[in-house]
Amino acid sequence: MLWFFVVRMAAPGSSSYSVQSCHRLLLVAFVALCSASSSSHGDRSPLSVVSRIAFGSCSNQSAPQPIWDAIVDFDPQVFVWLGDNIYGDNKRPFRVLGKERTIGPWKNVPRFFPSTEQEMRRRYQLAKSNPGYSKLRQTAQVIGTWDDHDYGLNDAGKEFSGKNTSQRLLLDFLDEADDSPRRQQAGVYTSYLYGPKGKQVKVILLDTRYHRDPLSSDGTILGDSQWEWLEKELNGPESEITIIASSIQVISNLSATTGPLFHTESWGRFPKERERLYKLIHDSKRSGIFFISGDVHFGEITRYDCGGQYPLYDITSSGLTQAIEKVVPPFFAFAVRAIAWLTPTTMRVSSVKCRYKSCTYAQSNFGTIQIDWDVVPQKIKVEVRGINGDPAIAVDILLSDLQPRNTNTLEGTWQHRRHCSLEIDLPWFWRHSFAFTFLALVSVLIIAFVLFAYTIVSVSKKFLRKFKID
């Protein structure tokens, strides 16, 4: 059943631009109009305005998933998968010694390895049959892209041999039509257009896996064909809002401030590629652009003021089941929040609406976008919500603030320069302050343990001497 006016933007060179496809589109629109009155979701017509969008990532199909109830209660018209829609690969336990060593200087096998096609299909079916998710599929259109674990292998890129099989399985999970251009192209990127003229929302889904070069290469993320397609998308007909969905974070570069202890995947690991993306957005002069992303197992909202002709936001929601605080004992949750607060960042948006001082949220979460088309100026509320649907991070964005402006005026305004310094450009000591703090804490714990052990041994010796004397 079609509830919305949706135009699908196919990849360049596909047959969807032919006259025959135009006739088909008209036929689909006619069928949608005829079926609108029988929609199970009230009076939403194919031309209805889209104002409520939810998104999420990192959902382990074998874990409890109570968060779907909160997503259904939010009542989104569209739900966007941002990757790790299932965990399709397998992992060996951490082992420094033994026959299979997965970490350390004597590592001899990779920790992660792919599943068979049959096992991947079984996991997708398990995810799809979840009662909460099934209920969402009845009330919202579900679209999405992938990340590494549903691509088939942790941190994998273009070298992964099973990517074509994984592409077919993902598109089956998303109920993609058999004749969809996504089934013919190299990669799962695509776009959607919602709503009538004057209130249109475009959603661009990127593929950050199929064409991605190795992490240490500073090569390409999207590949030539996807870059060509994206340029046409951004320079195409205007829409009031354009949401660019990336499975990995675009603006934040945590690896620059948590290394060498921890590393995350992000566009920041490919600085030339990210600069190309910013330049493309700038040159397109397209208004209303912001990013949504996943992958990192916590939520945050970041902002970059010097990447275009207006501030660029990235709303990160991760994960639906996989979250940092879920893998540590509850009494260590404060330590996770303290670490997040102490980690240097130049891009994270601070707000009085944040539940924690760090303005990160490391429990199960999903993202929401609410568009108020009727107020002046029009407003977008973006939030990261917890497992019960309560907002943990929230930012209000005026649509008028996402309009191309005079670059000189923009750079001369302090308000638009707060989030201009890249993490990699921070002073060396400050950039690595997290590592120094972490190592200092570990050193203190080791010293405390040694002193405690020394005290125990000393007291024991004195007790034994006294016992012998007596």
Identify the residue ranges that each predicted region occupies.
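Classical eukaryotic N-terminal signal peptides for Sec-dependent ER targeting/secretion
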Residues: 1-27
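Metal-dependent phosphoester/phosphodiester hydrolase catalytic core
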Residues: 22-24, 30-470
